[in-house]
Amino acid sequence: MKKILGIFRGFPGLGRVVSGVSLLETLRDEYGCCIEIISYLQGNRYLELKGYENLHEVVPMDYCSIGLLPTNVTGAYIHEKIRCFQPDIVIIDGEPLIIQALKISYPKLKIVALLNPADIENEQNDQDAMRYFNAMYSLSDLAIVHGLRSVSNTGNYKKLVSVNTILRKEILDVNINSTNNIYCLLGGGT
């Protein structure tokens, strides 16, 4: 049985947690994988709603504007989780510093980065910052870019796959009924 650990950015929104959890639950339910999930802040509130228990809580010094810091309490917790759980694959969404830290500590560990197209190409962001983020994300063994637009590998990534937006199973199971009501779903930065 494959063991998969998911580490999903828990703020400022839920987009990275929702898609990551959906992917892990599909791997568990459809392919028999054993899964563990780490998130924080709003991400943990979502996991609680989904029935997950015994969630690790961050302290303010555990994270910054670009995500988790690998050198504080939660960073140590992630390393301990990897040593105890011994995952075959770690799927990380929105945590560039964690990808780098895990590749330093566990160079043979297979890491998959879930990314938005704007994580790879974004003219609105400072381009020096984009080069930094791409350097961190490209340390992964596989980058899965999911969104409304396709991106190509500029040669920095070991393997990059660009796919349409990952849809939750609940959305695919919706029954369509004709009504005069209009509904709008908001979310996501891209």
Name the predicted role of every residue range.
Residues 2-11, 26-73, 77:
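Conserved nucleotide-sugar phosphate-binding/catalytic loop shared by glycosyltransferases and other
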Residues 89, 105-122:
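Active-site proximal beta-strand in glycosyltransferases
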Residues 3, 88-89, 142, 181:
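Structural motif
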Residues 38, 58, 112-117, 146, ...:
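Generic beta-sheet signal
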Residues 45, 90-105:
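An aromatic- and histidine-rich active-site surface loop
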Residues 79-95:
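Short N-terminal targeting/anchoring amphipathic segment
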